[in-house]
Structure formats: structure tokens, C-alpha cells
Amino acid sequence: MEHPLEIYNTLHRKKERFEPIHKPHVGLYVCGPTVYGDAHLGHARPAITFDLLYRYLRHLGYQVRYVRNITDVGHLEHDADEGEDKIAKKARLEQLEPMEVVQYYLTRYRHAMEALNVLPPSIEPMASGHIIEQIELVKQILKAGYAYESCGSVYFDVEKYNQDHRYGVLSGRNIEEMINNTRRLDGQDEKRNGVDFALWKAAQPEHIMRWPSPWGMGFPGWHCECTAMGRKYLGEEFDIHGGGMDLVFPHHECEIAQAVASQGHPIVRYWMHNNMITINGQKMGKSLGNFITLEEFFSGAHPSLNKAYSPMTIRFFILGAHYRGTVDFSNEALEAAEKGLERLLDAAALLDGLKTADTTSVEVGDLRKRCYDAMNDDLNSPMVIAALFDAARAINAVHNGQGTITSSNLEELRTTFRLFLFDLLGMRDERASSAGGSEAFGKAMDLLLSIRAEAKARKDWATSDKIRDELTALGFTIKDTKDGAEWKLN
């Protein structure tokens, strides 16, 4: 490859060459879901984005430890320091234990990720399983002088921290403006400044989720878990931290401050953020009530959907846009993605049957380079897909007798097409598996068509037509060619 991998670092607002701290090892941390409801399209985007990164880093030969956390405590409503824990509220409404809620939705989240062909992370730590580490983090920040205790809670002193470091380095926010605005809005409470954020919150006896600490019974602030767990599993400095763009502030800004305050230096080298999924121009999310769950996409059971969309259609739809660009939901866009993916899968299915010649009229020499150049340019998946569409046209041309290809060029085409479509973009052909098995299903179809061919040879048109008509009624397209019959599932 002529060009090394470059990724956009939100911290410096530019693309930078990726250079691991401890090559060939790479530490990757991605913020996972707060599990109090079914996963929706907005959850699918970061999962698929960083699955693409994970796959590509491994393909490049790196040994990747991928940590994606599960938030099951401390995430209050509206991402605030006051209010009710999202999971505790769900548990109260449904008259369940909080961990019942967590287990139910976490299981459903994992099933959805499996359907989307998202590889499981190396480690999937849960916030509630790392209370000791979070308490230790808070103690370190207190000892360094960047936090204070108030009414049994502990808050990060943003103004004090900003005197020695810079709060706002990731988001670009101005600390003076933030302090002035929060003073006008919040008035006086437990905090010295409204911009200060909770490291540990005191909990009343009726609070369902609470733990003992040096400051009394309580629970950790939302921002603590990622700093504590990232450091535990990836060390005091690791390569990449990813998440949705909506986490830049306050979550990731607070993570940076916590790390610097507790250990004297930043913990992350590259910050990567995917953009939002929008619906009618607004961010799709639970807080706005405008979300469509992944299960609803898969089943079509939502009034905004014209039909059901397969998991691979959803994955292809998301990868059809660059991860830093917005993606606006529409049925038209999903249907276009569905048709585009089908074209590529059809082309992939033709690869094994293409006949070679001594000469080639199809140019495939730069296909691999185009795909690698696109991936190395900040994971430019739309450009990879564009190159694959060009390759699909070449495959179809050879298949239709409008071009020729040598055996060496065909092997290059097969290897590159399958590497980028299946191994890296993570697509899989659901059509055969959804009909009850892939290889066995294909062999059964070939057997049926061979019986039909024998019937035609005997001029048994009734049997031949019956097989064709019955298969058509079941949703298959049967096409007779000079080399025999071909089939596909519509």
C-alpha cells in the first residue's frame, strides 16, 4: 500500500497518520449503549462504524484489543447530574429489578449486533462491575486537588482544573462563557459552579442502585466509567477512543479532564466520532421519541416504514455514507441501499462461474489500490462501494459475453471483491440463509434445475414448466441461458 492509514482526530480537527503507541498492539475503546430500551438505528451507526475500523485494523496486521462498555448505572436523564437513573426509572415503571432490565435489553442488543454482522468486542465491561475502579479514580482526582466533596457527593472542579490545563480542548467550548451561562441558569446548589460535573452522587435510602464509598452511599457519575474501564483494560495511554458525535460534550470532554487530573497526562491519542442518524432533520434518539428500533426495521412493524429491511440492508445503508457525515432516514434511501447491495451480491455470486480467456478486455488492475486508498483515507466506505460497483459492471460484462478476462485477472477480481465486500465491509448474503441454509440450499436448487433440464431434454414440457412456475411463485427468478438455467431469490 502506498498510503498509510489516516484517521480524523477530533482532538486536532484534522486527519492524522495512524501510528500506534505500542505497535503492533492497538487499544480501541468505544462507548457502548445505556441498556434501558431496544437498540435503534442511532445505536447501529457507531457499532457498524467502529466494527469497520476494527476489521480493517486487524486486516492490516494489528493485534487489537477492542473494549466496548455497557452503561448499566449512573446515566441520569438528559445526561445531567440531577434526576433519575435511566435504568432505575425503567425498572420502577416495569416493577423489575434494575439488572433484570439490563439483562433483557443487553441480550436483545447483542442479538441485533449479531444480525448486523458486528463482530463482538474483545471485552465488554459493565459499569456496575467496576465500582471499585471508579471510586479509586474519584479518590485520585480529589487527592490532586481537582474535586471537592459536597453533601455526600463529589464534584469535579472545572474552574480549578482550567487554571492548570484546558477544559474544552476537545469540544472547543469557552470555559468563561459556560460558567457565566450556568450561573444564570442554575443558581446555587451543591456545586461551586454549574459547569462542575458529578464524579460521585449521594443516594437516598430509597435509591435502588447505590454502593458504599468513602463519601457515603451513592453511585458513580456517568463520565467516570469510561475513564476507569479504559484505563483498566487498555492502560494509562491508549490509541483510539470512539463514539457518537453527541458524546464530544460533555461526556468525552469530561473523560479527558478526569484522566489528566488523575494521572497528569491524557489517556487517548486519537478521538474518533461518527455523525448522527437524522429523521426529518432531527437527531434520531430515545430522548426525542422519534426513533425506530432495529427490530422494527427488521420486521417492518413501524408506521414510518414501507416494508421490512434486512440487517444487511441497514448495514449497507449506514456504510453508504462516510461515518463523519449525517445520514437522513427515508424509505427511498433504504430501498436504494437494498437494490445496490443486491447488485453487488449478484456480482459476487457470478465470480465462481466466470469463464476465462487468453486475453482480457476488463481492467481490474487498480481495483485493489482504489479500495485500499479509500479505506486509508479515514475509512471512506462510500468510495470503496463505488469501486466495487465498477467491479460489478466488469463482472456482469464478462458474464454476459460482452468482455473477456484472464485467469490471473479473475483471481485478482475474486480476491479483492470478496475481501472488501465481505471481510471488511462485513456484508453477507442473507438470501440463501433466510431460505433455510446456504450450501445445502444451493445444491437443492441445482438439483431441481437439473431435473428440469432433463425434462426439457425429453421434451416433457409439462414437468419443465411446472418446476419453473412453482419456483417463480415461491419468489425465485429462473433465467435460461446458453450455459443452462440460473436462479436467484427475489
Swiss-Prot record:
Q: Which residues bind Zn(2+)?
A: C31, C226, H251, E255
Q: How does it assemble?
A: Monomer.
Q: EC number(s) on record?
A: 6.1.1.16
Q: Name one GO molecular function term.
A: zinc ion binding
Give me the disulphide-bonded residues.
none
Q: Which reaction does it catalyse?
A: tRNA(Cys) + L-cysteine + ATP = L-cysteinyl-tRNA(Cys) + AMP + diphosphate
According to its UniProt record, which cofactors does this protein need?
Answer: Zn(2+)
- Which named protein is this? Cysteine--tRNA ligase
- What single Pfam family name could you report for this chain, choosing any that match? CysS_C
Enumerate the subcellular locations listed in this protein's record, separating them with semicolons: Cytoplasm
Textual note on the cofactor: Binds 1 zinc ion per subunit.
